[in-house]
Regions:
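Conserved beta-strand-loop-alpha-helix hinge in the C-terminal portion
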Residues: 235-273
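Glycine-centered positions in the ABC transporter ATPase nucleotide-binding domain
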Residues: 42, 95, 235-236
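Conserved catalytic loops of ABC-family nucleotide-binding domains
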Residues: 202-218
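ABC ATPase nucleotide-binding domain signature region
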Residues: 62-130
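A short, flexible loop at the N-terminus of ABC-type nucleotide-binding domains that lies
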Residues: 5-62, 66, 70
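Conserved H-loop
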Residues: 217-225
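Asp-centered catalytic/switch region of ABC-type ATPase nucleotide-binding domains
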Residues: 225-227, 233
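ABC-family P-loop ATPase nucleotide-binding domains
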Residues: 45-47, 102-197, 201-205
Length: 286
């Protein structure tokens, strides 16, 4: 277990300090592999009622390949900001993040597709855009097509005309098809449902050895999908890091009003302004 100071780097599954910790211990390590993601003086909005409120201490840390991180915080607005920020939907307040490889759109999201497209056209479009990710995928297009047909989602159907459950299945199947270098998982209600079980097993296979950042508080999801946890304060400060079970236990003992359950957590409020300025448009779709 380790309580961390401001500047940190993921190494061996633990956020390790690059500077003297509050306890006066110098923990200076290096990351051997090229990071899949690096934060440089990175800061986001962290209070939906105050557009000027950002991280108390900017992030400077690296995420190496293969680390699957659960970001644990009681600040639901910060969880949302982190996902849409990494997805490129809102800019940071300061700094930047850079990475080696492809960051996928939030898992289960619409991937920027026009709802008037047919299922087949959507698959063709994304396969063309993410051709390299499809080439390196351990899930075949035929596997996905078979599952879609079993869910009565036929290639000639228009996305807009699908039922809600069909849309959930379709969009999760798209996220499962491609081998991204970094996956973003904000919500897990459908992913952890019985209806999504065949896709869940494929996604678990797909993310093996790849990076993941998740903001769900579903305990079953965290234990199945994440290797490590990063506990944040309400202003984005890194409070603790470690193996996922340790991180969950630490958060339960030290974060006021924190709890995890087997049910879905936040339902993001689409009518709120989740951008980094008062004048920006609302972002409510992935």
């Amino acid at each position: 277990m380790q309580v961390t100071p401001d500047a940190a780097s993921f190494h061996g599954g633990i956020v390790t300090a690059l500077d003297v910790s509050p306890a006066g211990v110098l923990l200076n390590t290096t990351v051997s592999a090229s990071p899949v993601l690096e934060f440089r003086d990175f800061s986001l909005r962290c209070d939906k009622s105050d557009p000027e409120a950002a991280f108390d201490n900017a992030w400077n840390w690296k995420l190496p390949p293969g680390k699957r991180i659960a970001v644990i915080t009681t600040n639901s607005f910060l969880r949302y900001q982190l996902i849409v920020g990494l997805a490129g939907l809102v800019p940071p307040v300061s700094g930047e993040f850079v990475g080696e490889g492809v960051i996928g759109w939030p898992v289960g999201g619409e991937g920027g597709l026009d709802s008037k497209l047919r299922v087949s056209h959507a698959l063709d479009f994304l396969s063309a855009v993410y051709g390299d990710c499809l080439e390196h995928s351990c899930v075949s297009l035929d596997e996905i097509l078979k599952l879609l047909l079993e869910a009565n989602i036929h290639p000639d159907l228009i996305i807009k005309g699908l039922s809600k459950s069909q849309k959930d299945f379709f969009f999760l199947s798209l996220s499962t098809l491609f081998a991204f270098d970094l996956y973003l998982i904000p919500k897990t209600k459908y992913l952890m449902s019985r209806a999504a079980k065949p896709l869940k097993s494929l996604l678990l296979k797909q993310i093996e050895g790849r990076g993941l950042i998740a903001t769900s508080t579903n305990s079953r999801f965290l234990r199945e999908f994440c290797t490590d946890g990063l506990v944040l304060g309400r202003a984005g400060e890194i409070l603790f890091s470690g193996e996922i079970s340790e991180s969950m236990q630490w958060a339960s003992a030290n974060l006021e009003s924190f709890e995890v359950s087997d049910s879905e957590q936040d339902q993001f409020e689409g009518q709120l302004n989740f951008s980094n300025s008062e004048s920006s448009n609302d972002v409510d779709d992935f």
